[in-house]
Amino acid sequence: MRHLLDFQGWTRPEVESLLDTARVMREVLERPVKKVPALQGFTVATVFFEPSTRTRISFELAARRMSADVVSFAAQTSSLQKGESYKDTLLTLEAMGVDAYVIRADSAGVPHQATRWVKGAVINGGDGRRAHPTQALLDAYTLLEALGTLEGKKVAIVGDILHSRVARSNAELLPLLGAQVFCAGPPSLLPQSLPGAHLTPRLEEALEEADAVMVLRLQKERMEAGLVHLEDYIARYQVTEKRLALAKPQAPLLHPGPMNRDVELEGTLADSARSLVNRQVQNGVAVRMAVLYHLLVGKGR
């Protein structure tokens, strides 16, 4: 594994190896001193051409927990505002000796292009609606913690599937671990196809006997005006206590964030014991530590 762009071509043993490393990193994070020298001497750049809170901070913490130097690039205060291209921005960082790049962009394919521009490892931190592999990895890790295994498990993903890179990456990854993925949303927010997932406009079909439920927000910033009416969406697709009763008892709830309470998910459920949202955030640091380790000094080298 030289880069992490998506899960095309990945095998189950490769995924399991990375998640095993994440478990070791989780143990590190539970120590009184949450730091190891594994990446001492390496430099990691978080290059975010699109705004982010969770992913950027999570990666920066992950790198620092392993003693790497971190460079945080913010598009709003960079030479991009003066017309500099993505390529020239990355080549500038390359000249400064960066070893790994975590790249987020509003356009699909930018991390793939970056692998041709720089010598360092490239990690896709989310590109357009195409992929968000580390989010899917932390989702899988969290589900395995809760369920023990994903073999034969039904995972329902509900919400704005059309614009969701999280749904696409989970549809690639979770079946590798044996899960069945059902994606539900309004017809206008479903793609024509999604490899690895069964698509349905019927919320009940996705939730029925689900072992776990992942809820996605409406990505209004990527929508055309009038694509969905909020009141109608809430009435038909909000995950409520009553609708969740269709899933298996105590089926865990996940959400990649940011969450719009009482829109895609009933607020009381977000705070319930079934909600693993905060656990996802905690696990995200360990998973991203594992990714950086594999790419820079571990089995990826």
UniProtKB/Swiss-Prot annotation:
Gene3D superfamilies: Aspartate/ornithine carbamoyltransferase (3.40.50.1370)
InterPro entries in UniProt: Asp/Orn_carbamoyltranf_P-bd, Asp/Orn_carbamoylTrfase, Asp/Orn_carbamoylTrfase_sf, Asp_carbamoyltransf, Asp_carbamoyltransf_Asp/Orn-bd
Record bears the keyword Transmembrane helix: no
Disulfide bonding pattern of the chain: none
GO BP field: 'de novo' pyrimidine nucleobase biosynthetic process; 'de novo' UMP biosynthetic process; amino acid metabolic process
Alphabetized GO MF terms: amino acid binding; aspartate carbamoyltransferase activity
Record's subunit section: Heterododecamer (2C3:3R2) of six catalytic PyrB chains organized as two trimers (C3), and six regulatory PyrI chains organized as three dimers (R2).
Protein's UniProt keywords contain NAD: no
Residue numbers binding carbamoyl phosphate: 54-55, 104, 132, 135, 257-258
Keywords: Pyrimidine biosynthesis, Transferase
Entry's Gene Ontology cellular component terms: cytosol
EC identifiers of the protein: 2.1.3.2
Originating organism: Thermus aquaticus
Protein's recorded name: Aspartate carbamoyltransferase catalytic subunit
Family affiliation: Belongs to the aspartate/ornithine carbamoyltransferase superfamily. ATCase family.
Domain of life: Bacteria
Catalytic activity: carbamoyl phosphate + L-aspartate = N-carbamoyl-L-aspartate + phosphate + H(+)
Binding site for L-aspartate: 82, 165, 217
Metabolic or biological pathway, per its Swiss-Prot or TrEMBL entry: Pyrimidine metabolism; UMP biosynthesis via de novo pathway; (S)-dihydroorotate from bicarbonate: step 2/3
Protein function: Catalyzes the condensation of carbamoyl phosphate and aspartate to form carbamoyl aspartate and inorganic phosphate, the committed step in the de novo pyrimidine nucleotide biosynthesis pathway.
